[in-house]
Amino acid sequence: MGLSWKWTALLSLLSALLCLIGPALAVKEHDFKKCAQAGFCKRNRDYADKAASQSSTWISPYQVALDSPSLKDGQIQAVILKTINAAGEKVRLPVTISFLQSGVARVTIDEERRQNKDIELRHGSVARKERYNEAAKWSIVGGLEPDLKAEIVHQDDSQINVQYGLEGKFEAVIKLSPFAIDFRRDGVSHIKFNERGLFNFEHWRPKVERPEGEENPEEESTWWDETFGGSTDTKPRGPESVALDISFHGYEHVYGIPEHTGPLSLKQTRGGDGNYDEPYRMYNADVFEYILDSPMTLYGSIPFMQAHRKDSSVGLLWLNAADTWVDIIKTKGSSNPLSLNAEAPSSTQTHWISEAGIFDVFVFLGPTPQDISKKYGELTGTTAMPQEFALGYHQCRWNYISEDDVKDVDRRFDKWQIPYDVIWLDIEYTDEIKYFTFDPHSFTDPISIGKQLDSHGRKLVVIIDPHIKRVDNYPINEQLQSLDLAVHDKDGKIYEGDCWPGLSNWIDCFNPKAREWWKTLYKYENFNGTMENTFIWNDMNEPSVFHGPETTMPKDNLHFDDWEHRDVHNLNGMTYHHSTFEALKSRKKGEFRRPFVLTRAFFSGSQRFGAMWTGDNLADWGHLQTSITMLINQGISGFPFSGADVAGFFGDPESELITRWYQTAAFYPFFRAHAHIDTRRREPYLLGDPYTAIATAALRLRYSLLPSWYTTFFYANRDGSPILRPMFWTHPSSEGGLAIDDQFFLGSTGLLVKPIAEKDKYSTDIWIPDDEVYYDYFTYKTVKTEQGKHVTLDAPIDRIPMLIRGGHIITRRDIPRRSSALMRFDDYTLVISVSKNNEAEGELYVDDGDSYDYLEGQYIYRKFTLTPNVLSSTDAEGRDTKKIKPGKWLKAMRDVHVQKIIVVGGTPDVWNRKEVQVQSEGRTWSANVDYHAADGAYYAVINRVGVRVGENWSIKLD
């Protein structure tokens, strides 16, 4: 057995290293297209240059047919006519402008001839003739109710003005010739479509075969077959891109369109000092050791952009799943000569370019960042309410090599008294990388792993990728092929490519039958070795294909219903993620537990199905710094359950770096350590003194704050709000914070955090957004601050720079435990940071952290309020909780109390006392108070409070 295991391990390692040759080369930028190498991007950039060169004489060749517009049930339906030659020949483009109850506007444009399937395909292709129009089917889940009060308030031969939204504050001014739209709020222009005349809808046209020896004009050279990196894209429908310039008037700062490694406030892309010379690209790809400060594409895409200026936010969703590029230019407006010292407002001009599909854009007019997040969440869904364990610490590497190895790691965490919740298995746990199997030599009894972990409430996550090994006597692949559930190549055959197992096929999760089949594979009786505490990691779902064009599959591959891969590429990862999410919900009849599924690839809507991480980063300071910005951007783009590999996937981090990374990651929404197979082991108990102790302290800080984390996720689930909140989101009136991306507030807790992400740095400057009082979280000292200025904090290696803003009440569980499950029925501590007005408030949301019973009212949701005269707890929704029939969990929570209250700040004459009187449910009793006033820290500790966390109570302070 021992010899067999060694040989198997060696062969697996050699196989992995051989496979690694493919993706490792992909880090080189020349393996990924630049705009000039992508025909449709080059054509549209050239189109923009042509328009700019002609300036005021440029006329966009698109106009709305004068007899076509009509408004009915909140929609204007019309036809845009595109003039395509000097003879005046025109192409008809049906357009629908929808005004929604939410105040969001939607514009869709299609191509009539392709709607009617009146085109010819080249190369004998069987691909769909229509433009892809199903992205909304996957991404949009609500918010489409029409605004029946929308009305035309002005119409003539040149334009139509539609008033819509709450109290009619929004207006769309639709210019008929050339076609353009001006979206206004309170009469002021905020977003303009086609202001620069760059709208371009490449209509279908037949290929004209030229006489032998005659070359195609340069404009046509990229219309048809296109070769890159040795792969030829046949493009059977010819050129079909859609592009539009969208201007944000008066907005210098725009955010979003993840996933990229640049700053939060997006850079310009047309060159110049400090700017990019390439557009931001969204084309999900497996990019090893990705480059920092780059617009280069990464693993996921969310085509959502938000613009913000003082007291105003707007945004848009470009709902297109094809390869997409975005150019950004920032301009200064014209100064008013009558205004003394008036600085001209900046504006941002964007140019969106997608290879295929229809034009489908949603416009959000705010006015606040919270409005944008909420409306986007109504459309695409909000973050799934996670299981509580998912917010704990996850320990992973490629790879824990045997069940004994896994059990030993688990025991060592306990020996060192380091909390963790989940241990992960990468691809080597399988039998020769055949998913839904365990290696029969190194994982002979995987159930024993699950049972050992379960004894302390811990979980196991195993990886399942979408590539299925193409080999005989493997039932999963045999079923995939016999049921015809795989992706096909352009000729209609099952597509074959290389990935970790070698020759592989890919499940096509656009196929409803494939999704149903996928569910059967996860049932406990079919996935032997799994149990109730086993969860799933979806990797490589861009999809990643070794040696494929740009490390993925050919664009002319065919999916279910004969849609080309080019049409759906950025959706592919989400459909796989969604399929696994639904599969975990149906593992056992009658088991209604929340799934946990991690994904690498994502799109708008992926937030409904679990967490994401930023892929294969490096163990260096730059990647640590960038991770903070990337995760903040994920949050304001609607996908806040996000993380990055701690402390870098590639490389062996120095002790200082790994320590600072743990301190930073204690504030990642998704907190997982992960490392490459060639790295040294670096579990926190191996770091040595003093680093193990410091990392452990960061982990314990995370666990103590889990009640606040869980409440913050509840908000994200409820209204789409980000977990890590940038300064512009929390303080939209403070102009100094619009570009800050290295500090954040944790939800609405008032915790202001600025992790140390530089070598040999032992102090830092935190920007203060308002004139409220701030306290040091660890010492309770009042920090001398000034609105709009920086304050310097000491940050020795064992300290996380962290303030708590006055006016907040946060919840903690302070007893160290091995896992979050073992803390579930621990008592709570309240930490109150008193505002300068001697007030504070906060909330606690808690449920069983596992099931969907919260949908039936099985939860506790409390509002804590401090006024100058009373501290109280009431139901946050005003429910009469006595009328709720308690289930098992709610009954158990009757024994859970708020036992300690720490009051930071406030006036000594209120808190410098020996005891307070506590009232709850008709009873009154005394609780002792310890008052501290030394070294600039004024705080009171109320001990043995003894109030049930789910009941009303008060402490009067007269």
Residues covered by each model-derived region:
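N-terminal accessory segment at the very beginning of proteins
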Residues: 20-391, 396-398, 403-411, 422, ...
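Catalytic core of carbohydrate-active enzymes
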Residues: 581-596, 601-614, 623-630, 634-644, ...
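Internal mixed beta-strand/loop scaffold within catalytic domains of large alpha/beta enzymes
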Residues: 192-193, 277-316, 573, 616-641, ...
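Short, hydrophobic/amphipathic alpha-helical packing segments
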Residues: 276, 280-283, 298-301, 515, ...
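Fungal secretory targeting signals
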Residues: 1-26
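Short, well-ordered loop/turn elements at secondary-structure boundaries
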Residues: 91-92, 156, 166-168, 176-177, ...
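Aromatic- and carboxylate-enriched substrate-binding clefts and catalytic-loop regions
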Residues: 124-126, 132-139, 419-695, 730-732, ...
